[in-house]
Amino acid sequence: MLSLRLLTIIAGFALAGSASAASIGIVAPQSGPYELLGQQVRQGAKAAAAKLGLDVVEIHESCEDGSGGAIADGLVAAKVSTAIGFLCTETLQDVLPPLKAAAIPAITLSSRAPILMEDALKYGWPLFRLAPSDRAESDRIAEIILRDWKGHSIGLVDDGTIYSRELVDRIRSSLEENGLKPTLADTMRPNQEQQVALVRRLARTGISHVFVGAERTDVAIIARDAGSENIPLTLMGGDAMNAANNPVPLAANVLAVTRPAYDTLPSAQAVAGELRGAGIEPEGYVLPAYAAAELTAALAEATQAQSKPAPEILAGGTLFKTVLGDLGFNPSHDLSDNPYRLQRWNGQRFEPADKAERQ
């Protein structure tokens, strides 16, 4: 197996070779089951780096326990300005203490592990998340229900998985803290060919609006069966709805609280076109990695101008213009702006919705 200490230094950019050039460390899988995701990270970050004149240091992320120390050694030795990627929580546990000593921020594009972030805040590790926290999802869902579903009979349904139960529990707690008690809380059996019994149970209870914490296919089956039973349910799912529209197509008008497709953002239109022109489809982690590289370049300038460590500037809430819009971090090192938005399925794609009601 190739040593994790092996670095690939990419030069030849506009400002590459300059002693003062900022540099970005790209930590992402180069082989194995996550190679495709790692390729998306590299494509996005390197495209932005070429445009911005960043030197690039690529390090393989094996996602194995105990691999973070060697990765940290490589990043520190290369004196990168910022390290981005980190698709695996296993990497971060050991990589963060050395990066703290070197004042190198680590920006993860995917890790949502709450315990890791708790440790990072406790020990002052420079971990920042472009991936939204689980709390951000439940907060936005509860906010929308409180705004749009007051006066209706509300049902909350989970699929029995830990993630779904915890999501629905957080939503219910937030609703009840704000004086809105759901009429029904239920657990469904996922991965079934039909959900007629659940749909009829909701109807008997008088439920008109229901949030379903389940995979997209399960929600699609509920919507299909509600339609066949002529039961007018307003259905809303969470971030799990951002998935392939098969094997059961999702009915039009089903709602979801999820992140918009990055390439549909107004701030991303030009870059998405440039990437497609270069043969790179702006999907998955491509645009988040591009944004992380933009943030790296702007942060390097701010660090020099303010004579402050980069992690301190990030933790201070400074906003940076990126392909994903203005990005900054709150004191918990999460995104300061909740990226989840209410969307409605139009039969082909999700589109922004102003209100969580059927049309």
Model regions: which residues?
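Extracytosolic ligand-binding ectodomains
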Residues: 2-10, 21-359
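N-terminal signal peptide c-region/cleavage motif recognized by signal peptidases
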Residues: 16-19
